[in-house]
Amino acid sequence: MKRKTFFDSRDKYLSFVNSTNEKSKIAFYLFKKIEKISTRSPIFNVLDAGTGEGTIISTFLSGLHKYLPNKPIFVVGKEISIDDINVLLSFLGDRFAEHKTLIFNITNCSYKDLNNSTSDKVKFEKLELVGKKGIDFTKILMSLSPYIRKNWKLSFNNKNGSIKPKSKIFLTIYRKDQKKKLKDFIPRNISEIPKKYDFIIASQCFKLRSPLIQTCLLYTSPSPRDRFL
């Protein structure tokens, strides 16, 4: 049997993540890249290949707002951990207050699903945030915990140890008072999800077991290679 490493235990993994400043270091590193971004598109598309508990993407969005204060921002955040999503949601209230035209999508879909324009296996749902202040949005977002527990259940393969979602969900969150401005960017089905992104975040605090090239291709296939960090 292969020797276990710290990330095979969620408790050990969380202990490592929460006792280091690695995520903050990554977020500030990303700030340096934002300054070099130039885009003429009407919306800025971001893919976070694994949001975790949201420290990196939340901090990154605050920095992105500094450079693109008036441009709509569209984020696809991929995550299968119920615990991580609940923490992520607690961070996003202030981001929606800071950047009014933010569209934040949370999904448990695979990368293959996101790149398949004809898939009918993904359920699309929307949440319109009502309010003006960060605390208004935070209350709504944190009330989603039962919804997340219900829709982010996993199935386990006893033969190979793999896990996958029991159902595939794509949840789109935006401010209701910005719906008119954002209506052309709110996805209704898989074909309306961006296939190219202006910025990809693919950050893990450990060495993946999967082959590096295979993993990079999964992350970068929907985006220009020179934006991969």
Give residue ranges: language-model regions.
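Single conserved hydrophobic/aromatic residue that forms the stacking wall/gate
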Residues: 219-229
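Class I SAM-dependent methyltransferase Rossmann-like catalytic core
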Residues: 2-41
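A conserved beta-strand element that flanks and buttresses the S-adenosyl-L-methionine
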Residues: 201
